[in-house]
Amino acid sequence: MALLLKNAHVVDPSVELDGVVDVLIDGDKIAEVGENLAVEGAEVRDLSGKYLVPGLVDMHVHLREPGYEVKEDIESGTRAAAKGGFTGVCSMPNTDPVTDNGTVVEFVKSRAAEVGHCRVYPSGAMTRGLKGEAMSEMGDMVAHGAVAFTDDGRGVQGAGMLRRCMDYGKMFGKVFMSHCQDEDLVGHGQINEGKVSTRLALEGWPAAGEELQIARDIEIAKLTGAKLHIQHISTAHGLEIVRAGKAAGVQVTCEATPHHMFLTENDLDETYNTSLKVNPPLRTDEDAEAIRQGVIDGTVDAIVTDHAPHTPWEKAREFELAPFGMIGLETSLSLVLTELVNTGKMSVSRMVELMAIKPREILGLDQVQVKAGSVADLTVFDASATWTVGEDGYESRAENSGFAGRTLTGRATDVFVGGKQTLADGCIC
């Protein structure tokens, strides 16, 4: 049966649409978009007061399967994604076994098709076992559906190895996503190096440990002609390096997380909240402001979560022993609405670019547009809905949110993936 979505405020800058119209879904496609549509026999849903946009895509997510299902699995991770308004996620390869060959890529895809609540686009490791010693089977992974290459978690430490990966792998047309972390400089760093790390007696993580590799990777991308994407950028100077690389004509893009925009090192205190232990670490107020401005002015290309679930017992350990990472799929859209859109600092149109259009473009995915003939991957949200993070639990298996207890305004209400509803009135279908 066809589904007619009435009176939604549709925003899609790719087709210059920003206004109240009706959208007709028939099967897995959008059949018609227009005013005052009336279709005999169609189910009708009134979306008055809500926004409808192309389906959101998070291009940096840890689903943990295979190997770490105690933290998260594809079913629970994609359920959290649907709750947060996402129609697709790009999964990171630091699984067990590592996603460094076509067999594991095929497993992730087949598992997602079986139990997933959204689309899953697997990324593959640049190097075998994420060890930085030998190139992975890039061609095999692409043949099975890998959309990008990354050694996310520690990055490729050797410049020569990164060059070889880019020189060889660029023939497949995929983007290389760099986790920029110079392990010699970072050492056993726990939080940003500065006054807070000194006060809390925690080993510092210098900003230069990220910035040096951003500069290095941009130079290698320039040398090889490969497409480069800088992951979870967290410093003002790192953003300036990316800005300069773009101006020089290098094929470089970058992403930012809500926690690097809306949390800082000053949120850490003597409670040693391990949910605030992330990689890269929360930086200074000035860094967070620079990242927010980069998101608004176009330097930052995509907003991602770096959703990193861990078990409660892992995060309950001493700060130095607890793993890095926080969950974010269920809060990302709401945080952006609360902090940027509802405050008038950023338009809904710009948000759609950051969370739907550019992620698909960077990953080489087919674009979703709110027009007849396009795949019906759609996100509906209520920009005025108020809720408290964690008050009703999480869809994710994990609870390590750095925003727990915060009241937010704006939340996804409905999600459609290929015309199939995965979230209805805020509930997983």
What are the language-model segments listed below?
Residues M1-V39:
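N-terminal metal-binding scaffold of metallo-dependent hydrolase/deaminase domains
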Residues A8, V23, D28, G49, ...:
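Divalent metal-coordination and catalytic microenvironments
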Residues N36-V53:
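Active-site metal-binding motif and surrounding structural segment of the metallo-beta-lactamase
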Residues S48-A112:
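Metal-associated gating/positioning segment near the N- to mid-region
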Residues G102-R119, D167-S178, L335:
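Alpha-helix-loop-beta-strand connector modules within alpha/beta enzyme cores
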Residues M135-I303:
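Histidine/acidic residue-rich metal-binding segments in metalloenzymes
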Residues R199-K227, G294-D297, D301-I303, A308-F381:
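His/Asp/Glu-enriched, well-ordered alpha-helical/loop segment
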Residues E318-L321, V375-C427:
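C-terminal cap of metal-dependent C-N hydrolases
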